[in-house]
Regions:
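Active-site donor-sugar recognition loop in glycosyltransferases
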Residues: 325-332, 352-353
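Catalytic cores of eukaryotic secretory-pathway lumenal/extracellular enzymes that build
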Residues: 300-307
Length: 443
C-alpha cells in the first residue's frame, strides 16, 4: 500500500520475531522488507513448519524409473495471463520432445485467455486440479511416474507446498516464481545463476543451488509488440519532459527508493514518474509522499491496464528510462522493459530478489547499468537523464544486443535448463544425494 508511516518500527519488529522463529509475516512479504538471506531462510522454515507441522508419508517409494524420456511436470496456479506464464510459454513449446515428456498441473483458475490456451497446447499432458486436495494431486504425479517436479510458486499467492511435502517425485525443484528459499527439506534444488545465487549463499538455502549460465530467468523471444503506440498525451505524459518509468507492483516500492526518485524529479525540470495503476490507497499514499518531498503530485502518472500484453509492451516506447526497485527488483517487468527497448538502471542487492536486475543486464551486455550502491544508482540515473548522447548510446546498444545476446535467446536457455534437469536426473539415477552444481555453456 506504500504506507511507510511505521516502516522503521515494523522492520525492527519483523526482524525480532523472525529471529525468534515466529511466523508473523509470510516469506514472500518479507522479501519486500528485508534483504538478509539468513532471515529469509528462518522465515521460510518457520512458515513451512507451521503450514505442514507433520510431514505426510512419502508417495514415491524409491523406485528408479527407466523411461525412454525424462518426465517433467510443472506445477502452478498461474497458467493464465500472469507474469510467470508470459516468459514460460515459449520454453514449454521448445522443450526437446525426444528427451523429455512435459506435463502441466494447474491448481489455479482458468481465465479463458489466449495465454491459457497456448499454455495448455504446449504440454504433452495438462491436468486442471484446482478443486482436488493436495494428496490427490500428489498421487496423480506418482501414478504418472514423474521424474522431476518443478514448483513455479514457492511462497507466492495460492502456492500449495503440501503437494510436494507428499514427495510425489524423486526430484523436486523450485524455479522462477519465488526468488528465495522455500525452507522446505522436501525440495531438492533451487534454480538460479551465478549472480542471483552464488554458491556462498548455500547456507541460506534449504535446497541445493543449481546455477544456469547467462541468466536464470527464461524469456519468450516471440512476444509481439504492437506496431501502434498511443501518444504521450493519451497516456497523460508530457510531450517533451523526461519520463522515468517503473511498472513494478506497489509492494516493491520502498521509501528509500521513492525518495531517490523524488530527488531526481526535483533536479530534472519537467520530468515525471510513470507508474503502474495501483489501488487508490497506494496512489494517495504516494501522492502524499511526493508532496512531503516538495514534488507536485501531478508529476506522478499512473498507467492503467492495457487490453493486451502487446499494447503494454508498446507503451514502453513512451518512456525514457526504467528505474528498478530494491530490495526486491523488477523481474518479469524488467524483462518487459528490455524486450521493448527501454533501458533499465538497477542497484545490485544483497540477496536473490535484489540481484535479478543485475543478472538480466549482464545477460544482455549492459553491466554498466548496474549500480553497486544507492548513491551510485542515483548518480547513474541523473547522468542518463541529463546527457542525451549517453542515453542514446545505451539505447542503441540495447537495440543491437536484444537479439544477439543470451537474455532473449529462448532456445539457448532451453538447452541450459534441460542440461540442469539431466544433471539432477543423472545424480539421482546413480543413487547419489542432491548436490549443488553449475551448468556449462550450451554448444
Amino acid at each position: 500500500m506504500c504506507d511507510w508511516t511505521r516502516t522503521a518500527e515494523l522492520d525492527r519488529e519483523i526482524e525480532a520475531h523472525v529471529t525468534e522463529r515466529k511466523s508473523i509475516i509470510t516469506p514472500f512479504t518479507l522479501l519486500g522488507y528485508c534483504s538478509k538471506a539468513s532471515l529469509q531462510l528462518k522465515c521460510a522454515r518457520s512458515w513451512m513448519q507451521d503450514a505442514i507441522p507433520v510431514r505426510p508419508q512419502p508417495l514415491w517409494n524409491g523406485a528408479i524409473y527407466q523411461h525412454e524420456r525424462v518426465r517433467i511436470v510443472y506445477l502452478s496456479a498461474d497458467f493464465r495471463r500472469h507474469a510467470t506464464a508470459y516468459p514460460m510459454a515459449r520454453l514449454l513449446e521448445l522443450h526437446d520432445r525426444t528427451r523429455f515428456e512435459v506435463l502441466g498441473v494447474s491448481f489455479g483458475v482458468d481465465d479463458g485467455s489466449d495465454m491459457r490456451s497456448r499454455l495448455i497446447k504446449s504440454f504433452d499432458q495438462f491436468h486442471a486440479v484446482r478443486l482436488e486436495p493436495d494428496h490427490a494431486v500428489a498421487k496423480l504425479l506418482t501414478a504418472r511416474e514423474v521424474d522431476i517436479a518443478v514448483d513455479l510458486m514457492g511462497h507466492t499467492q495460492d502456492a500449495r507446498p503440501d503437494i510436494f511435502a507428499h514427495r510425489p517425485a524423486p526430484i523436486q525443484m523450485s524455479y522462477l516464481g519465488y526468488p528465495g528459499t522455500t525452507g522446505a527439506e522436501f525440495m531438492d534444488y533451487v534454480i538460479g545463476d551465478a549472480i542471483v545465487l552464488p554458491f556462498d549463499q548455500q547456507e541460506f538455502f534449504s535446497e541445493k543451488i543449481v546455477q544456469l549460465p547467462d541468466c536464470f530467468m527464461v524469456n519468450d523471444s516471440t512476444r509481439p509488440i504492437s506496431a501502434q503506440t498511443i501518444s504521450r498525451a493519451q497516456a497523460g505524459l508530457p510531450e517533451h519532459g523526461f519520463v522515468f518509468c517503473c511498472f513494478n507492483q506497489s509492494y516493491k516500492i520502498s521509501r528509500p527508493m521513492f525518495r531517490i526518485w523524488m530527488r531526481l524529479l526535483a533536479r530534472i525540470e519537467g520530468s515525471v514518474l510513470w507508474l503502474s495503476q495501483l489501488n487508490s490507497r497506494a496512489v494517495q499514499n504516494l501522492r502524499n509522499e511526493a508532496m512531503a518531498c516538495g514534488i507536485d503530485p501531478e508529476r506522478l502518472v499512473f498507467a492503467p491496464w492495457t487490453a493486451t500484453q502487446a499494447d503494454h509492451l508498446a507503451r514502453h516506447r513512451l518512456a525514457d528510462l526504467f528505474l528498478d526497485t530494491l530490495p526486491y527488483n523488477a523481474h518479469t517487468t524488467a524483462g518487459d522493459a528490455l524486450w521493448a527497448g527501454l533501458p533499465l538502471v538497477t542497484c545490485r542487492g544483497e540477496s536473490f530478489p535484489g540481484r535479478v536486475g543485475a543478472s538480466l543486464l549482464n545477460a544482455i551486455g549492459l553491466p554498466e547499468l548496474v549500480a553497486s550502491s544507492l548513491d551510485e544508482y542515483e548518480a547513474l540515473i541523473l547522468k542518463l537523464a541529463t546527457d542525451p548522447s549517453f542515453l542514446q548510446s545505451i539505447r542503441r546498444k540495447l537495440e543491437q544486443n536484444r537479439l544477439s545476446y543470451p537474455l532473449f535467446d529462448t532456445d539457448r536457455f532451453r538447452r541450459h535448463i534441460e542440461a540442469a534437469y539431466l544433471t539432477a536426473w543423472d545424480i539421482w539415477q546413480r543413487g547419489e544425494t542432491p548436490r549443488s552444481f553449475r551448468v556449462g555453456l550450451a554448444r
